[in-house]
Structures are given as structure tokens and as C-alpha cells.
Amino acid sequence: MGTIAVRYCSKTKMGNTRRIAEAIAEGAGVTAVSILDEPKLTERTDLLLLGGAPYANIMAPELREYAESLDPALIGEVVLFTTSNWSRRTVIALKKILREKGIAVADSYFYAHMLQIESKMEAAKQFGAKFR
């Protein structure tokens, strides 16, 4: 497949998005990195797996800023993932931001309901493994 990167925004103590990101990364054979720890993607990647969850039903400002700062020349394609109680607004908003920047975004994405994280861990690993 080429180079793969997993980036995520997780701001709660529960760390649902972090856990799903780590499982996806394990399946893909890479390491998940928080955008709060490493705010810029500095090297070309063929596939960026990017995820976050809505907070108070809106995308985290840090995730929005990260998406807006991405350099289209550094990214082949983005595949999204999200964790939430009901809303997939984060995915919809990210698709819009990234596509307006000219970044290719896959139509399909990975979703894990916040109350079913444990039962979605294996599926997250398998999702990541598809991109090896």
C-alpha cells in the first residue's frame, strides 16, 4: 500500500477514540499518534487514517484546525474513523474540509459507538489490516 499514518484527537479520560485509533494502527502495522502531541504531518503519507469524536455534538476545534492545516501535497488519501454516542457529524465535517482542500477522502469510514468500544476493538484492528 505504501506509507500509512494514523492520527487522532481524543480529549476525554475514557480515551475511546485513542483506543480505537491504537487498534486501527495495530492492524495497519503502524503507531497511532495524537494530534495533540504531534500537531503537524511533516512527511508524505500515501494513506492517512484520521479520527476524532464530537464534543457537545461538534467537532473538536483541535481536529478542525489539524484538518485545515493539512498539506494536500503530503497526502495521497484520507480514511476517517469516529467514536460517538450517535452523531457522525465529525466525519461529515472532516470530509467537507478535506475535499475542499483537494485531498482525496474515502467514502467509507469506521464508526464505533461510544458504548460499544470494547466490542469494536477487533473490528478496528481488521479495518486497519485492510490497508497493509
Task: Give each language-model segment a name.
Residues 2-37, 44-132:
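FMN-binding flavodoxin-like domain, especially the glycine-rich phosphate-binding loop
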